[in-house]
Amino acid sequence: MDVKDRVAIVTGGGGGIGSAVARRWMAGGARAVVVVDRNGDAARAVGTEIGCLGVELDVTNEAEVAALVERVEGEIGPVDIFFSNAGAGAGGGVEASNEAWQAQWELHVMAHVYAARAVLPSMVARGDGYLVHTASAAGLLAAVGSAPYSVTKAACIKLAETIAIAHGDDGIGVSVLCPQGVNTAMAPRQLGDGGTDGIVEPDYVAEVVTAAIRDGRFLILPHPEVQTYVERKAADPDRWLKGMRRLRARSLDLQEGS
């Protein structure tokens, strides 16, 4: 799908990847990009910058998401692209609190479910639409020291696969973005999934995302090395797990020495 003349909603749009994508799509001729963020001031600032609507919204609140889509469709037009990008890091393993696990589940899984529920009926009726989920390389591989994050990002990828299987023949495109480290506010908190192959800039990720949806490519990998790691994991899971245990041990040694 080309973004030209399209109406898009971008969550997590107040900064980082989201704001970079919003700017890129407007520069590419989008009709409108609605910028959504839980930080209303940030959303409105980006919206003002690109000449579009900026909205404060909690993506884990289904009623708010549904109301936004209804508003956009009434005031601007049908939503062509929903970039479900909001996310946050969380450390810990199975010992992390139930509240921490649930918060990550709501943000990294249910927020995408709510977005899909809100836009899919209209998209399917038109036979045209695109969903993009921001997951993480941690969802394809793992993140040392961040179980709630990597587990819920893995679920995000499976949800995207499920929607693509169910609605690919209905004219619905689906992509899932799986970066390693990106130079955003989250970068200092990225544990184990961001430093191996370098930190990339949000503007670069925006270009990669735009090209992927233009080509209808499901898996978006701003760090191409991730594909190699996924193939190695699939070829020999036991060897991969041993390697991850070594990585964890090195990480713990570094933490103890700091």
Name these PLM-found stretches:
Residues 40, 57-67, 98:
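The beta1-alpha1 cofactor-binding region of Rossmann-like NAD(H)/NADP(H)-dependent oxidoreductases
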Residues 116, 152:
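Active-site helix of classical SDR
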Residues 66, 88-102, 145-148:
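Conserved mid-core segment of classical short-chain dehydrogenase/reductases
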Residues 136:
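Residue(s) in the substrate-gating loop at a strand-loop-helix junction
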Residues 2-33:
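Canonical Rossmann dinucleotide-binding motif of NAD(H)/NADP(H)-dependent dehydrogenases/reductases
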Residues 30-45:
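Conserved glycine-rich Rossmann-like NAD(P)H-binding loop of the short-chain dehydrogenase/reductase
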Residues 176, 192-229:
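C-terminal helical subdomain
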